Each structure stands twice: as C-alpha cells, then as structure tokens.
Amino acid sequence: FQVGGLGIMMISTFFFILSNKRISLKQRQLIMTDMNQPRLSGIVNLIRTTFLILISFQAIGGLLFSFYFKVTGYYDRWSDAFFNGFYQAISAVTNSGFDVTGHSILPYSTDYPFLFGIMFLIFIGGIGFPVIMDFRSWLIDKLTKKKLHQIPYRFSLFTKIAFFSFLILFVAGTITIFFLERNHLFQGASLLNQGVTSMFYSVTTRNAGLQIHDLNEFQTT
C-alpha cells in the first residue's frame, strides 16, 4: 500500500534520482501529467521534496507510535511495537485503511493521544502535495525571515481552497456524526469520548477508512 499511497510515478522517479539516472523529457511529461502540474520546470525537485516529506512523517509517526505502544503496554516485545507502530503510521499517511489484526484499530477506541496522532497523519497524507509544499515554503519563510519581494509569504489559492474545504467538511462531519449518534452509538459515553469519536470518523470516512467501532453499531436511518 506504500506504492499505491505515494504513487508509482513518485516512487519510481525517486529511485531514478537515487541511481543518478537521467530522467528523459518524455518521463518528465508523464510525471507532470500524473501530478497535474502546469509546467515541467522543477518537477523532479518537487517529487524529491514531497517524497522525503511524506517518508519523514511516516518515520517520525512510526517511531512515536512504536515507543508509545511499548511504554503504554500494548505490546510486550519491541519488535511487535515497532511493527505495529510503523504499520499504523504508514497506513495513515497513505490513507490506505489496511490493518493486520482484522478489526482495524478498535483496541485504541478510547486512546485519545493515539487517535489524534492518526488523524494528523491522515490529514497530512490526504491534503495533497501542493498544499504540503506550500506550507513548507511558508515555514521556511518564517524560520529564515526572508520575505519574497519584501512582503510576507502568501499561500496559493489552491492551498486556501483545499485547507478550508477540509476544515469545513471536518467541522460539518463532526457535528453531524455527534448529533446523529448521540442517542445511539454514543449512548452512555462521556462527552469527551463522543467528541473525539465524532472528529475521528469525520476524518477517516473521507480518506482512510479506519474504524474504532463495529460499523453495525451505527444507526441505519
């Protein structure tokens, strides 16, 4: 699911870069089409940077989850903690929704730190590489204090639309799930649990397909 999540074109191009092979004009045109870019210039550097950013999020998320699983006692052996930690991180970033247990992430249904971590990684993997690159440029601008053309960095229109669309759908989905399931799935649950669960399903149903309840428990009307 790593190949399916990041894209065969991105991964194959990155290995071309590692092997110092020249990427032909035809290959660059295919990459441009695959990534929906308007121009050829900088396309290889874009893939390299995006690939490294996504892999970095997977690695950092995997390490944090692994140590968290071991410290909190989910797994006794480090090997199991690392395997499951990295698997969950990669699955979240690639928005694949796969699991190795047969019951998704139901054991973590009330583990709020883990759920927020999963939601963040799903967001990173689903928001799109143009938005990620835009935020990267903004962060570099803030850290280096270098202003392009002596004005503060401005996000592109695409980034603004993508981010606010995600935010609107996230809030609307959370509120909808909260009120629809308040007297059904959430009956007897704490307000905190109801809120976090609503947020989680608002995120995961749009991209990742992970679940922390048996879907048969949801109301059907």
Language model features with spans:
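Membrane-proximal intracellular helices of multi-pass ion channels
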Residues: 1-221
